Amino acid sequence: MNGRVDYLVTEEEINLTRGPSGLGFNIVGGTDQQYVSNDSGIFVSRIKENGAAALDGRLQEGDKILSVNGQDLKNLLHQDAVDLFRNAGYAVSLRVQHRLQVQNGPIGPQGEGEPSGIPIAMVLVPVFALTMVAAWAFMRYRQRL
């Protein structure tokens, strides 16, 4: 592993119907409350259990909301974004950016000829120690003869 974290970024249109608890999620971010360094976007901070977003299942905590009913959320104060969501109506269309962390390394069984991931020293040191003990025991045995 090289210590780098890679992300796969995808966008999706999600249509939600407002329920008794609203759209069923909380937001963070905005130009006055940056949630992500160098990004003043609006992000999902919490999905409410049994809310519209949870029942739909596609919106996830950490998703960036790009637009609400076609209105861009760039460069908005947090409260302006909250007001936009509150006044969005009964049927709400969200343009969302998902950031999925990509695993840095193999995800399945390793093929033939691929390294096992065990450092060679973890194998060689015990083998070397065992060889030394065997050599010492052999030398002691020969001295007795």
From Swiss-Prot:
Domain PDZ: 13-100
Mitochondrial intermembrane compartment residues: 139-145
Membrane topology reported for the UniProt record: Single-pass type IV membrane protein
Swiss-Prot/TrEMBL keywords: Cytoplasm, Endocytosis, Membrane, Mitochondrion, Mitochondrion outer membrane, Signal-anchor, Transmembrane, Transmembrane helix
InterPro entries: PDZ (IPR001478), PDZ_sf (IPR036034), Synaptic_Scaffolding_LAP-MAGUK (IPR050614)
Pfam families: PDZ
Compartments, as annotated in UniProt: Mitochondrion outer membrane; Cytoplasm, Perinuclear region
Example GO biological process: endocytosis
Cytoplasmic topological domain: 1-117
GO CC annotations, alphabetized: mitochondrial outer membrane; perinuclear region of cytoplasm
Main subcellular localisation: mitochondrion
CDD domains: PDZ_SYNJ2BP-like (cd06709)
Subunit structure: Binds (via the PDZ domain) to isoform 2A of SYNJ2 (via the unique motif in the C-terminus). Interacts (via C-terminus) with RALBP1. Interacts (via PDZ domain) with ACVR2A (via C-terminus) and ACVR2B (via C-terminus). Forms a ternary complex with ACVR2A and RALBP1. Interacts with MAPK12. Interacts with DLL1; enhances DLL1 protein stability, and promotes notch signaling in endothelial cells.
Protein name as catalogued: Synaptojanin-2-binding protein
Organism: Bos taurus (Bovine)
